[in-house]
């Protein structure tokens, strides 16, 4: 019967773990919905500011802003890597690392160097081990970060670009497709391509008084990059919570299956013990007779 007691102890332990994973699943689901709401709110801003940049840039075609000009000889590129602070979110970070490294190897093949700015503790730990040149790290942003939280890391990368220390900036992050699907991707932030459809249409909504549109363009471009990084952070949080919710749901279901299996083993062990005891009683009675 000692085996049966051991199985009962295991079942009790797994039940406690199951309660924890179930609670984590519910918390992640709540946080995911909030992150989705923030993501939906911030998207129109980024879209509109992109159109304004296209208008202002087209109105001053004689003023080629460095953020809009493709550099001919690329010697070094920068990456902003958006990861999570915590684990227990399935393969979210691992898939992103694979995608980012695959993109980086294209530059390495041409002997082009890379600088990294990393958001999230998981990314920092990985690229410190991997050997990347990490310029800055932003972590502990929480579940509801503000734009101010990422301005510093964006400034580090933009300063490198302004000094021509790097010739292009990319961002690696996770795109929220739906609750079950999160897609890792790498896209270019700088140099920025203007919206060709808006420019060709020749339709202008804005009159600038006084005409300080050059300064406005400078400010808008910086704000746009900040908004893109912030949007990526918010979207990555939605991906994180979604992946964690699914992972905890699977863990809860697996715990239930394991409990069922252990109960079956326990019942068999208990039945075998009872059968053995009955056999011993019968044998003892027969010996007395």
Swiss-Prot record:
Belongs to the ATPase gamma chain family. Gene3D superfamilies: 3.40.1380.10, ATP synthase, gamma subunit, helix hairpin domain. Produces ATP from ADP in the presence of a proton gradient across the membrane. The gamma chain is believed to be important in regulating ATPase activity and the flow of protons through the CF(0) complex. It comes from Coxiella burnetii (strain CbuK_Q154). InterPro entries: ATP_synth_F1_ATPase_gsu, ATP_synth_F1_gsu, ATP_synth_F1_gsu_CS. The keyword Kinase does not apply. GO terms for cellular component: plasma membrane; proton-transporting ATP synthase complex. This is ATP synthase gamma chain. It is found in: Cell inner membrane. The gene is atpG. Keywords: ATP synthesis, Cell inner membrane, Cell membrane, CF(1), Hydrogen ion transport, Ion transport, Membrane, Transport. Signal peptide: none annotated. One of its GO terms (biological process) is proton motive force-driven plasma membrane ATP synthesis. F-type ATPases have 2 components, CF(1) - the catalytic core - and CF(0) - the membrane proton channel. CF(1) has five subunits: alpha(3), beta(3), gamma(1), delta(1), epsilon(1). CF(0) has three main subunits: a, b and c. The keyword Transport applies. It comes from the Bacteria. It is a peripheral membrane protein. HAMAP family: ATP_synth_gamma_bact.
């Amino acid at each position: 019967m000692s085996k049966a007691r051991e199985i009962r102890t295991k079942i009790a332990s797994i039940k406690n773990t199951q309660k924890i994973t179930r609670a984590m699943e519910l918390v992640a689901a709540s946080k995911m919905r909030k992150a989705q709401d923030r993501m939906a709110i911030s998207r129109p801003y980024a879209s509109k500011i992109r159109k304004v940049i296209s208008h202002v840039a087209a109105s001053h075609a004689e003023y080629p802003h460095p953020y809009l000009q493709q550099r001919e000889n690329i010697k070094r590129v920068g990456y902003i890597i958006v990861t999570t602070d915590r684990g227990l979110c399935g393969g979210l970070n691992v898939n992103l690392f694979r995608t980012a490294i695959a993109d980086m190897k294209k530059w390495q093949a041409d002997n082009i160097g890379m600088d990294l700015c990393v958001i999230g503790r998981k990314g920092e730990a990985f690229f410190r081990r991997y050997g990347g040149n990490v310029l800055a790290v932003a972590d502990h942003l929480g579940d509801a970060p503000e734009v101010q939280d990422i301005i510093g890391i964006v400034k580090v990368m933009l300063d490198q670009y302004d000094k021509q220390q790097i010739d292009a900036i990319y961002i690696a992050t996770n795109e929220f497709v739906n609750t079950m699907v999160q897609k890792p991707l790498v896209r270019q932030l700088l140099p920025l391509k203007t919206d060709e459809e808006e420019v060709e249409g020749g339709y202008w909504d804005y009159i600038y008084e006084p005409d300080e549109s050059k300064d406005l363009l400078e400010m808008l471009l910086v704000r746009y990059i900040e908004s893109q990084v912030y949007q990526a952070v918010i979207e990555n949080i939605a991906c994180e919570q979604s992946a964690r919710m699914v992972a905890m749901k699977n863990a809860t279901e697996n715990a239930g299956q394991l409990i069922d299996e252990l109960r079956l083993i326990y019942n068999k062990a208990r039945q075998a013990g009872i059968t053995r005891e009955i056999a011993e009683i019968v044998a003892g009675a027969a010996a007395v007779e």
